[in-house]
Amino acid sequence: MKLKKLFLLILIVISSVISSNVNTNEGRLNTDIKIVSYNIHSGVDKDMFPTLFDIIDFLKNCDADIICLQEVNESAKVGFQVSSLKEELGMNSHFGANVVNLNSNYGLVTYSKYRIIRQNHVYLSSSKEQRGILHTVIDVKGKNVNIINVHLGTNKEEQEEQLKELQTFIEGLGNEPYIIAGDFNAADINLDDNCIDVAKTLDKSNTLTFSLGIERIDYIFVSQDIVPINYRVIIKKLSDHYPIIAKLRI
């Protein structure tokens, strides 16, 4: 009888452990995150009026898990924007300067509520102003998720080469999930079939993201194992671009 009770107790413990592992895995598979991508134009609007504090307020109110910013200027002249945003948002961050001058560093920054476990900055082939991608790996409840913050050039030939380099970089990630967000400076961007265009998938690709144009030039792409839930373009005239926001299921 004692052996039978002991056997039953062992079965209960094993069942409990298995159930716990299943629930943990389900939690990892069903984590919803909010991401914002925004070219902040060095903290000025299209008329060059300073808007950095309004941008900070907007981003704080978004309550996003991940924020990818382009055209961020870390200099005494316009304010140390990377540092100011980090302090106000209270998030982990990684900055990559595409352009380094004597008095300023200008480029990409990614903020994350999740722990950053790896990061690197890659220069893209550029014939005019230097462009690049900022790669950050975050830990989302035990799962590595690659965040790729992008700013491409404005010249068509330059863009084609930069897209090839971006594609090669993505292929190097293997099977890890990824999110690509940023300013591509071109309409009708298509990556390979493994990349999901979030706006197009949710039938919202006709919304412009650039206040001086009539087309969508800012994008969020995800790998096949990430599910787009919703997508919005926010008409905020704090930059020459509009911010884009997506909810994704990891």
Give short role names for the model-derived ranges.
Residues 130, 137-140, 148-156, 160:
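Internal catalytic-core helix/loop-beta-alpha segment
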Residues 63, 90, 113-115, 174, ...:
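Residue-level detector of structured alpha->beta connecting loops
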Residues 46-50, 158-161, 233-234:
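Short, solvent-exposed loop/turn segments at secondary-structure boundaries
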Residues 42-44, 120-124, 150-158:
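Surface-exposed cleft-lining segments at the edges of enzyme active sites
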